[in-house]
């Protein structure tokens, strides 16, 4: 059985042209037609994004199940990570990965019931800007009760790592979650208009085999967000 996964930092639907155009994000997600999307920087009731509940809006437009994990509260509204799934989401938890007084960060974990397969786990992370912060966050995530529980089923861990130098890959590889990008090179996703860094990554438990991995780069994705969406097709 093949399932497709996408991680995409949508930058609140605000493109590199500084315009809020959620219809561009909808167009991109619809054209990719993945089974599961892990989205970061998803606004809920924030003026800059027309007070939209973006996760609910995307869910309705795409006809998908969704769950939202809010991490950062603003004067009006909040934002965080969202998971959209073609299949029912049966459980979700938001893991707090905030280090000290740094910006609030989290990992949204969901169990998804896939027909003819059973449950899988999808964990959507958005890590910090400092190297020491990211290392602490990924170790805390791996050691969490939620992660220990969800790794009992086929698991995909994906999101915006902010890890330009691939320092987290050895830690995750040792934990049994190799990068789905086999050669660990190329496939840069940031900034979208001229990608120099591979910040957006997908890791999978050894239940999975990779059949395809790519960055979605076209005229629309170059402007819709400051990140490009990253896609993996996995076989189980």
Please annotate each region the language model reported.
Residues 13, 40-47:
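Active-site neighborhood of divalent metal-dependent phosphoester/pyrophosphate hydrolases
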Residues 1-36, 60-61, 65-68, 72-236:
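Active-site regions of metal-assisted phosphoester/phosphodiester hydrolases
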Residues 45-48, 75-77:
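Short active-site-adjacent helix-start/loop capping segments
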Residues 46-56:
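Short, flexible, glycine-rich and Lys/Arg-enriched loop motifs at helix boundaries
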């Amino acid at each position: 059985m093949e399932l497709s996964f996408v991680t995409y930092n949508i930058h609140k639907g605000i493109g590199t042209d500084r315009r809020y155009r959620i219809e561009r994000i909808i167009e991109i997600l619809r054209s990719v037609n993945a089974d599961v999307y892990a989205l970061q920087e998803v606004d809920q009731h924030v003026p800059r994004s027309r007070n939209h509940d973006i996760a609910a809006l995307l869910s309705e437009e795409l006809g998908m199940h969704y769950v939202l994990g809010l991490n950062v509260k603003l004067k009006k509204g909040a934002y965080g990570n969202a998971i959209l799934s073609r299949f029912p989401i049966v459980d979700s938890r938001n893991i707090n990965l905030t280090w000290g007084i740094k910006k609030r960060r989290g990992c949204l974990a969901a169990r998804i019931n896939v027909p003819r397969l059973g449950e899988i786990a999808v964990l959507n992370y958005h890590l910090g800007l400092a190297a020491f912060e990211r290392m602490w966050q990924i170790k805390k995530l791996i050691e969490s009760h939620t992660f220990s529980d969800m790794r009992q089923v086929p698991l995909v861990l994906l999101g915006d790592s902010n890890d330009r130098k691939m320092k987290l890959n050895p830690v995750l590889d040792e934990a049994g979650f190799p990068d789905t990008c086999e050669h660990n090179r190329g496939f840069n996703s940031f900034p979208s208009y001229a990608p120099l860094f591979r910040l957006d990554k997908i890791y999978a438990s050894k239940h999975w085999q990779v059949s395809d991995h790519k960055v979605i780069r076209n005229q629309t994705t170059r402007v819709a967000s400051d990140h490009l969406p990253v896609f993996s097709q996995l076989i189980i």
